[in-house]
Design a protein with these regions (language model features):
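Helical lid/core segments from catalytic subdomains that handle acyl or acyl-like groups
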Residues: 131, 198-283, 290
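A glycine-rich phosphate-binding loop feature that marks nucleotide/adenosyl-phosphate handling sites
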Residues: 180-186, 240-246, 357-359
């Protein structure tokens, strides 16, 4: 009556089925034994799709990795003969609410609500889900981002998106409608947490032009400063503490759910209009040495959301990084310019798509 909540599900696990549709489709819990995730496969690829209320990217990758371990032991007797069937030590079962255990009651709002530039355009037919991936060598990326620009790989790749968007939609972007990229930050390292529940906050990398022309070097510098100014523990703590404080407030807790839903929609719409896109970096994924010969790559996708019909994810495994864009738009100019800029910096780029743009 007052809050949504999750219960332990004792029903049989959802059936693993062959992938037959676009990823990130709605999960109908009533048709899925009340589970909010699905597992599918396509040839030698295992897919995990998760409703974000269950966990964030780090929690999802942990589950997918353990699921892959279990599958490989079933498939390859040489593994099952030497490795026990127990969960690996890197798999956490911790379900602590790390927001509650770490929030500061005195925090004030640090959110920006100014509207951002939103990408618009003709949509793919039949609710199409376009995927374009660029595979890049991590060693070369690190060399270019650090030695040439003095920034992290994450900042470099976000800058490539911002610059591509700026070049494509320059006349629509202004100080009043800046390019703003929502960047999720994993809070576990800051608070020594290993929870499998959500534990992240969003910061915004902002590019607000105040002159006619910008070079890529200038955009990189702006994005670097924007991100670094927010990457302090006190600031990150204040972001989630403000949310938790509102949730814990007695007056808010006593408001009926149907009224909360109205407020949630208003807040969601404001947040959607405040960011041009979301780019999340899952980071470098490692697996136990025994399994490495059987695993080629990890990938991650984000589904679209209101106002953000083009999103990006960054995932790396060993020395290969996958920079993935999902989009509902027919036009791929932004994605193309992202990878052109990366290639211009001497980084080898191998492109793959899911074929939607050729149908």
């Amino acid at each position: 009556f007052f809050w949504y909540y999750l219960e332990e599900n004792g029903k049989p696990a959802p059936r693993v089925e062959e992938e037959k549709d676009y990823p990130c489709r709605r999960i109908y819990a009533q048709k899925n034994n009340s589970y909010l995730f699905r597992v599918t496969y396509y040839k030698n690829r295992i897919n995990l799709e998760v409703f974000h209320v269950l966990t964030d990217g780090m929690g999802g990758i942990g589950f997918l990795r353990e699921l892959t371990y279990q599958y490989l032991r079933l498939k390859h007797s040489e593994l099952s003969d030497t490795i026990s069937d127990r969960l690996s030590e890197e798999t956490s079962l911790n379900r602590e609410d790390s927001y509650i255990s770490n929030y500061n009651k005195a925090s004030k709002s640090v959110y920006a609500s100014k509207k951002a530039f939103l990408i618009k355009g003709d949509k793919l037919p039949y609710n199409g889900f376009g995927v374009i991936q660029g595979f890049l060598p991590v060693s070369k990326l690190k060399e270019v981002s650090r030695n040439k620009y003095g920034v992290s790989i994450n900042e470099y790749l976000i800058s490539a998106f911002v610059y591509a968007t700026y070049r494509t939609y320059r006349r629509f972007i202004s100080e009043e409608k800046p390019i703003r990229v929502a960047v999720p930050v994993n809070m576990r390292p800051f608070f020594d947490s290993n929870t499998t529940k959500n534990f992240f906050v969003m910061i915004s990398a902002e590019f607000s032009p105040n002159k006619e022309e910008y070079s890529f070097d200038e955009v990189v510098a702006v994005i670097h400063d924007s991100i670094q100014s927010q990457m302090k523990k006190e600031h990150l703590e204040a972001i989630f503490s403000y949310n938790v404080s509102n949730e814990q407030h007695f007056a808010a807790r006593s408001v009926p759910l149907f009224l909360k839903n109205i407020g949630i929609k208003v807040v969601y719409t404001r947040a959607a209009l405040a960011n041009t896109t979301t780019i999340t970096n899952i980071g470098n994924i490692t697996v136990k040495e025994e399994y490495e010969p059987y695993i080629k790559m990890f990938h991650s996708f984000l589904s679209f959301s209101k106002g953000q019909e083009l999103k990006g994810t960054i995932t790396s495994y060993k020395d290969i990084l996958a920079y993935t864009f999902t989009s509902s738009f027919e036009d791929t100019t932004v994605q193309r310019r992202v990878f052109q800029q990366i290639a211009k910096d001497g980084i080898d780029v191998q492109i793959e798509t899911n074929g939607v743009y050729y149908e």
